[in-house]
Amino acid sequence: MNRIEHYHDWLRDAHAMEKQAESMLESMASRIDNYPELRARIEQHLSETKNQIVQLETILDRNDISRSVIKDSMSKMAALGQSIGGIFPSDEIVKGSISGYVFEQFEIACYTSLLAAAKNAGDTASIPTIEAILNEEKQMADWLIQNIPQTTEKFLIRSETDGVEAKK
C-alpha cells in the first residue's frame, strides 16, 4: 500500500468509527435518567457526531473512495466499540463515563494520525475538516474527564439512598 491508499483506508475507518460512536451515544443517552448534565452533553456530542459523519462522507466522495468497503470497516469498529463499552452493571453511569472517555481518546489518536496522513497525501482540502473534528473530540474528552468526579460522587450518594436508582 502506498501513502494515499493508507490515507483512504484510514478515512474509511474514521467513518466507521463515527458510525459506531453514533450507536454508542444514542444507546447511552437513551439510558441516562438521573444525570441530566451528562445526558445533555452526550446528546450534544451525538449531534456533533452525526455532522462528523456527513463531513467524512464528503471527504470520501471528494477522494472517490468507494463506500462498499466501509461495511467491513464498520464491523471492525463495532467489535471494538462493544469491547470498550461492554455490558454495564449496577455502576453503569460511572463505567459508561469512563468508557466514553477512553473511546474519545481513541478517536483523538485516530484523528491525529489521519490529519498527518491527509497532510502527507496532499489532501489540503480535508485538513480543516479533520482539524475541526479532532477539536470536537478533544472538547468531549475534556468535558468527560472534568465531570467524571462529580458523576462518581453523585452515583455514590444515590447508591446509598434507599429507593433511589443510581446506575443510570
Curated annotation (Swiss-Prot):
The gene is yciE. Gene3D superfamilies: 1.20.1260.10. The lineage of its organism: Bacteria, Pseudomonadati, Pseudomonadota, Gammaproteobacteria, Enterobacterales. This is Protein YciE. It comes from Escherichia coli (strain K12). Coiled coil: none annotated. SUPFAM superfamilies: Ferritin-like (SSF47240). InterPro entries: DUF892_YciF-like, Ferritin-like, Ferritin-like_SF.
